[in-house]
Amino acid sequence: MLRSGRTVHGAVAVVSLAALMLSSACTKGADDGSSNSGDSAQQQVQATSGAASCTPEKYNGGVPKLDLKTITVGFAQSEKEANPFRITETQSIKDEAAKRGIKLITTNAQSDLNKEIADIQGMIAQGAKALIISPLNSEGLDPALKAAQDAKVPVMTIDRLLTTKTACKDYLGWIGSDFVVQGQRAADAMIKATGDTGNVAILLGASGVNVTVDRTKGFKDQLVAKASKLKIVAEQTGDFTREKGQKVTEQLISANPGITAIYAENDEMALGAVAALKGFNKKPGDVKIITIDGTKGAVQGILDGWIAGVIESNPRFGPLAFQALEDFYSGKGVAEKTIISDKEYTKENAASELANAY
């Protein structure tokens, strides 16, 4: 998800060609079960923050060097696999483990923080010697992280950042998108789609996660930076779900009939908004919708005229996550943050890029 203007705080290391060329075996598409195995569909590294210095000797006072092919790796999924992002994320981890011949056990917390803690503790008890975790919240996993530390089990985090924890101490490292920049790019797309005029409603993501905070900040700050004439007239959480996205949009349109644009902080809420607009007898394009994710449903929404633009957030973490574990155990080292690059779907490229959506 490479775009000019993206900044990374901290030292930026040069990413090796090998890392840039990583691709996984077939990754299942979320909507139709098809596979997206082309390099253009896979995550690409844009930059790393901090030196690639976390090694077994430095992590948590020192942990054993192990061969990934001889151990069990655990993957903790935070949310039920009911939306394309989570379906594709889990499948990518499974596909890459199979490709590398690594024994994998998986859990799903069903959007319950206490269950995710118990899941992680349970995988450690089952003998997992390394973990990949997709955190439900940016905070609150302390008991699970403590269990991993005590057992000398390294933890690689993906997607949501543990904002109060320290890399190479509480967890190994993090791989994910620059969510602030996603919000900035969404603002740019909104300005273009609306001609920089109108009333905007924001469908906020779930509370307590850095994704929501950063996507909101990026969007609002960019409107200010561009001296935009757009006016934010309402914002309410849709919890990243289609059902709540529809319900909240219905409430917002009823209270603010002058809304002419919607910024949805993920595609599921955007598709819920589309359903709500249809209920108000709106026509495609009457209300401009900009969203973030890159699901097939949202990209198809561009082709159908209901969605004006989509900023990608790529969930295919498998190749980079397992490569990070390989680099860790080999002594090559892992960076504090690995930022991936995101595409943008527009009416100009939606048809040709639909196959790369998930």
Where are these regions (language model features)?
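A residue-level marker of the well-folded mature domains of exported/periplasmic proteins
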Residues: 2-20, 25-358
